[in-house]
Amino acid sequence: MKKFLFIITALFGLVFAQGVVTQLDNGSINYSDQSITAVGIGFVPTNAVNAGQARRMALRIAKQDAMRQLIEIVNGVTLTSETTMSGAMVDDVINTKVRGFIRGARPVGQPKYLSDTSVEMEYSVPMSGISDIILPPVTVPTPNQPGSDNASAAPGGDATQAGGVTGVIIDARGLKARPAMAPQILDQNGNAIYGPGKYSRKYAVENGVVGYSKTLEAAQKDQRVVGNPIVVKGVG
């Protein structure tokens, strides 16, 4: 089990700082920079008439393969402790929108031309696009929710100058917790203290409901809590 920290800001916006990545055979889910990547492989077709055409066709095949891999990876993304994207994808509208979004994936780096004449290409999509599709169309923030008009736009600001707490870092290392796009934080009585309704839709799409970190040092430098965050140990 990988160790990580998550951070709740003073406005109850959540961030798990950098470095938490789920590596897969065909790509990765980076919960730190909120991105999903997949590697596609293309082989030179036998009907290519010249080297230039062979390369173009191999790149096209690699992209198509990466799109298929991205769909597979997105299906496995954890939404909450109990659900994955595959559950949401049974909805035809969501399925169509997600597939359309994935078709707009951007290449990462340059193609890798392998000794067996195949080509590898990496493509990536931001989690924000997935959030924009699966989150309810309207989430009305309360005055203290991140993203509401009454919430501070920048962390640290007045609270830091006044010596107040700028955020809460919950140390989840050693727990059976796993990264998710939209986890809930519960108190010891099982009551939700962070989750749906505690943040605006706009905030969740633009910033992510959560972020991740492997180290306390990285968490303390996160811009949403930087200044004077407190650290609390998670218990379950």
What is each PLM-predicted segment?
Residues F4-G13:
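Sec-dependent N-terminal signal peptides
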Residues A17-G236:
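Domain-level marker for long, solvent-exposed, non-transmembrane regions
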